[in-house]
Amino acid sequence: MEFNDMTSDITGGVKEYDIATNGISLHVTEQGAGPAVLFCHGFPDTSYTWRRQMNAIASAGYRAIAPDMRGYGRSSAPADASLYTPLHTTGDLIGLLDALKISSAVLVGHDWGATHAWNAALMRPDRFKAVFGLSVPFVTRGESSVFERMRESGRQDDFYMFEQIRPDADQIWADAAVTIPGILYWASGSAPEGEQWSPLDRTRSLYRAAPGPLPSWAEADYVAHNIAEFRRTGFHGGLNYYRAAEPYFTLSAPWKGAKITQPSFFIWGKSDGLKELYPFTLQQMRAGLPGLMGGLELDNVGHWVQHEASAEVSEQLVRFLRTVDAVLS
């Protein structure tokens, strides 16, 4: 493994560096000192999505570490979709901890990043001592994949993941100046009821242009950053996670029925379109998360909880970290 510090100084306690591990290079942003907290972003995003939460936990005495996940930002982006399974992302995260000589960390994940976090905790409970998930809950591996279930129910023409793996998906997303504001708006709680993104209705897709300026929670510097990054990289790497999802289901057979026993917490938006797909009650979640310490549904919030309710998410995260410290000490 190689560690290459990309900054000669630290501005506002934030530093960036590259780590070569697991066959790729990860670009990492870090802030603070103390027990390690590892942040995993989703689609279409970069580590910059976490800047508010990173600042909050660094101020509370924790070490916030956020990579651009493989396929995104300034990290490597293999073209081969088979290299984007949870086996690969868990390997990336373990390699990151090893390079930084960190024995264990708490995971925080949003969207696909929540999937990465849940799976890493499932596969390596010795290295990941707790999980704080946003927007995508953990569901134990069952008998069939979501793709199979959608085909069997005749919803293959409606289900959004089939759109994400179309041969022309890269081109559909390519105009980042349109698609980045669009997904932020339509998947949020700010979009009008009945028009918000639905994963099962193609007329309410993620591809629609935003109707006007974004709400204030979508901070201009964050939106501009994402537009610039995806103009530079394209969307192929991020879309590869969707392409890898169905093939990985077969590989995940060893974890059929397996549960995550570490302490966990889950936050979701009441207006998140993913509620059409996943169980969003604490009772249902505890079937796979016996260590679930609680959860929170946020009113008037959609998929982008770390932005739409930034202060609340940061407060809940710091509270969870302190509770985990007390429980595991």
Curated annotation (Swiss-Prot):
One Pfam match: Abhydrolase_1
Q: Does Ribonucleoprotein count among this protein's keywords? A: no
The protein's Enzyme Commission number: 3.3.2.10
Effect the entry attributes to changing V136W: No significant change in substrate specificity toward linear aliphatic and aromatic substrates
Check the record and name the Gene3D superfamilies matching this protein: alpha/beta hydrolase
A molecular function (GO) held by this record is:
hydrolase activity
> Which keywords has UniProt assigned to this entry?
Hydrolase
- The AB hydrolase-1 domain covers which part of the protein? 35-308
Q: Which reaction does it catalyse?
A: an epoxide + H2O = an ethanediol; (R)-styrene oxide + H2O = (R)-styrene glycol; (S)-styrene oxide + H2O = (S)-styrene glycol; 3,4-epoxy-1-cyclohexene + H2O = cyclohex-3-ene-1,2-diol
Subunit: Homodimer.
Function of the protein: Catalyzes the hydrolysis of various epoxides into diols. In vitro, shows the strongest activity toward aromatic and cyclic aliphatic epoxide compounds, since it shows strong activity toward (R)-styrene oxide, (S)-styrene oxide, and 3,4-epoxy-1-cyclohexene, but very weak activity toward (R)-epichlorohydrin, (S)-epichlorohydrin, and 1,2-epoxy-9-decene.
Full protein name: Epoxide hydrolase
